[in-house]
Amino acid sequence: GGVRLQGFYWDSQKETNWKVLTNQADELSKYFDLIWVPNSGTPSSYYHNSTSTSMGYDPCFWLTHNSSFGTEDELRTMIATYKAKGTGIIEDVVINHKNGLSDWCDFPAENVKGRNTGKEYKLSWSLADICKNDECANKKDEKGNQKYPVTGAKDTGDNFDGFRDLDHTSA
């Protein structure tokens, strides 16, 4: 067993960013085994405007971790600081949330070299990765044709109209 602290609340980027939580590690690690933090993947809103205040649940990039809560370096420092004190960090990931860079379905390809391993990590996306019953399938272009001809399997979970429903059966 153990005790987990929710290290954020809605729109708490200033009060609970990575630097603030790192500075509180001496105190918090005395009482908590885990600190729960929001998704750290870079949202498209932050990519376009670094003053964006996204909570991170609209990630566009999964392999880049700069957000309104801080930079990837600040995140790594926070994790290392708590780990050294025996406290873990757990990230709140909504695996079915994926946002496009500038529209519904333009998911950028990602290519990142691991800092510790030197290994290349790559992600690429297509319309086949989006469930065929996602609401984007109902969007029409100016000629009345399906704007996003998505071809993934039917959604296996709850539908959420805010972001694309990803086909996890094709992984």
Show the residue positions of the predicted features.
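Substrate-binding/active-site clefts of carbohydrate-active enzymes
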Residues: V3-D26, K30-A171
